[in-house]
Amino acid sequence: MAFGLTVRAKRIEQGIGLNDFAERLGVSPAYWSRVEREQEKPPRDELVERAAAILGVRMDDLFVEAGRLPPDMRSDLRRVVQTYRRMRQILPK
């Protein structure tokens, strides 16, 4: 399932109206409706994190639905890549 559809299903399941949810996120209901209908790309990290908190779901799961790694995993991955590159320079071929 895609990000918007996942959030919409969870929001409806919990009985949270679109207007209330958008207000809690700090965005317009029109914008959030487009996100939920997959007419907008998944929102910036901060909104994904807030949506997860409001819905009580794992932030990592929503980031996966958004097609992105969570911010902490991005920095971990960056460090792994940097370490790998350093090791390739040091180790004999």
Language-model segments: which ranges?
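Short, charged recognition helix plus adjacent turn
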Residues: 63-92
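Short, basic-rich loop-to-helix N-cap that marks the start of a DNA-contacting helix
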Residues: 15-17, 23, 39-53, 69
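Recognition helix of helix-turn-helix/homeodomain-like DNA-binding domains
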Residues: 26-42, 65
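A short, Lys/Arg-rich alpha-helix, primarily the initiator
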Residues: 1-13
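Alpha-helix N-cap/N′ positions at the starts of helices
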Residues: 2, 27, 79-82
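Conserved hydrophobic/aromatic packing and binding residues within compact polymer-binding modules
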Residues: 7, 21-22, 32-35, 62
